[in-house]
Amino acid sequence: MANLKYYDVILKPIVTEKSMNSMSEKKYSFSVHPEATKTQVKEAVEKMFAGTKVASVNTMNLEGKNRRRGNTSGKTSKTKKAIVQLTADSAEIEIFTGL
């Protein structure tokens, strides 16, 4: 298990059409550190965004995509994605409002 601080766990929010539609169910998508656990993601969200209470966390490891540039082929880096479900009485996350 990685020794990560809560501000190192969440890298950036994922803003796609699918993630925006799931916000009505209080589900938010984040790109997280590859070694972060579900408990670390839960603690990071509750500490970084005041008034939020996490009900559940779903994580998935995404493989890198194959890319070519001329005759050279390679792969993009692997990433980890977390979908955080907030409780009904929880406050909304401010960075997603107004999008």
Curated annotation (Swiss-Prot):
Key words of the record: Ribonucleoprotein, Ribosomal protein, RNA-binding, rRNA-binding
GO cellular component assignments: ribonucleoprotein complex; ribosome
InterPro entries linked to this entry: Nucleotide-bd_a/b_plait_sf, Ribosomal_uL23-like, Ribosomal_uL23/eL15/eS24_sf
Keyword Ribosomal protein: yes
One Pfam match: Ribosomal_L23
UniProt KW Ribosomal protein keyword: yes
Protein origin, superkingdom: Bacteria
Gene Ontology BP annotations: translation
GO molecular function annotation: rRNA binding; structural constituent of ribosome
Xref: HAMAP family: Ribosomal_uL23_B
NCBIfam families reported in the protein's UniProt record: PRK05738.2-4
Subunit structure: Part of the 50S ribosomal subunit. Contacts protein L29, and trigger factor when it is bound to the ribosome.
Family named by the database record: Belongs to the universal ribosomal protein uL23 family.
PANTHER family, A to Z: 60S RIBOSOMAL PROTEIN L23A
Protein purpose: One of the early assembly proteins it binds 23S rRNA. One of the proteins that surrounds the polypeptide exit tunnel on the outside of the ribosome. Forms the main docking site for trigger factor binding to the ribosome.
Protein name, UniProt field: Large ribosomal subunit protein uL23
Protein source organism: Lachnoclostridium phytofermentans (strain ATCC 700394 / DSM 18823 / ISDg)
Lineage: Bacteria, Bacillati, Bacillota, Clostridia, Lachnospirales
